[in-house]
Amino acid sequence: MSELRLCCDLLVQQVDKTKEVTTTGVSNSEEGIDVGTLLKSTCNTFLKTLEECMQIANAAFTSELLYHTPPGSPQLAMLKSSKMKHPIIPIHNSLERQTELSTCENGSLNMEINGEEEILMKNKNSLYLKSAEIDCSISSEENTDDNITVQGEIMKEDRMENLKNHDNNLSQSGSDSSCSPECLWEEGKEVIPTFFSTMNTSFSDIELLEDSGIPTEAFLASCCAVVPVLDKLGPTVFAPVKMDLVENIKKVNQKYITNKEEFTTLQKIVLHEVEADVAQVRNSATEALLWLKRGLKFLKGFLTEVKNGEKDIQTALNNAYGKTLRQHHGWVVRGVFALALRATPSYEDFVAALTVKEGDHRKEAFSIGMQRDLSLYLPAMKKQMAILDAL
């Protein structure tokens, strides 16, 4: 990549020199310098280096790496991309639709990633150039297995009940001429679930503890639950962002499981590392939480654009990126993002991927349901981000 950058700089210099010669009419041939030959040589080197970079990129995104499952990987709560020809993956079954709360023997947040990807994650801090096979599950001690599963189901049932109450309230206010279009919800009309209403754990489920403490386990579970949104944009398009989110979730959880009794909130984890003078150490939980927050803000910004009526997914993503992650990325990462934007799906395909039942996106009730769900989900997400900003 450094060679490519060098070629770019040389090209700029030599093009400027050529323009200068053309304008002044003065040639450097007396000095033995043929600007045209130099420019041609640099162009050839640039194209050759660019071709090598593309070969490396293609090798990184081969289907073998994207879909290889490590031997013995757990099958619960798999956040992965299906081997479908279509880049958008509708969530037609529970494994694709949600991140389940389950347990493992050491009570950790499992994220199974193949060896090739592990090497990349060790060499990159905040962006990774491969997709992953991820097992994302939050758990407690072995004797609370059933409780966690039940709690996840209760949270989902409570959310569905809240949605029905929300719809009834909208119905009652439907006669108000100043009511927004989504308020025009007629009683008895079909209620269609969406990706956001069927999450096992959502940011809207989080109950803050004393002093606005964000419960660590519930927060990490909510983060895992929203990661599949990136899959709805295509299995490889935003693999780098997905890998970044997943790795940072894992780092925070690794800190959490070292002392669950003490690190009940995110604030306590940060305070502990600040007092130990390790908060700014590479791969610390505090650093991971910082990048996790940035990634979540990007997702929130994108979903807000969609909720506000932006029908061009590329524009929605670009606007969200410009307001959040772009300022933290160098020119190389920005270039990768620009390339990823070219492969984004249409609005119709993206919305179709957020359905629970195939074909629901064609119904008017689904659009109303999306507005309803995002109206509950995004403010809750914003609240968590505001608390993290204050840390």
From Swiss-Prot:
One of its GO terms (biological process) is ceramide transport. One of its GO terms (molecular function) is ceramide 1-phosphate binding. The lineage of its organism: Eukaryota, Metazoa, Chordata, Craniata, Vertebrata. This is Putative protein PLEKHA9. It holds the Pfam family GLTP. GO terms for cellular component: cytosol.
